[in-house]
């Protein structure tokens, strides 16, 4: 079974060309994952790991030295030198009318080791993040004031009353 071949056809999720909830796929998932392993449908709106928003900066991505897609950011902020983002936890980012709280640095997991094009794993990537960045790269964030963000919007780092409730 090619686990990476997951797509939708007419609204149905397929695994290797078969319906995700078919007995054949269930048997293969259990064979790969062990007794009791199964796929489940999740219709929830939230699809995130730690917090709803993962922000990276171009400076940190350049320091990382690999394809930025390995970090899985929702938002990349340009014009940031080096690892300046490491000083941002506890503050907020104002992007147009949007206000984003910066909670903390993201502790990276094994997903960074997978090439986004080939899905080939290179554990040296994740090991390098732990060695060079204490395992943390990019920012766990959440939206305080919603709205639309567009490419080219100015980003301002904000502290104080506007960021009440953001842990330092």
Residue ranges, per PLM feature:
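Metal-cofactor-dependent catalytic cores
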Residues: 1-168
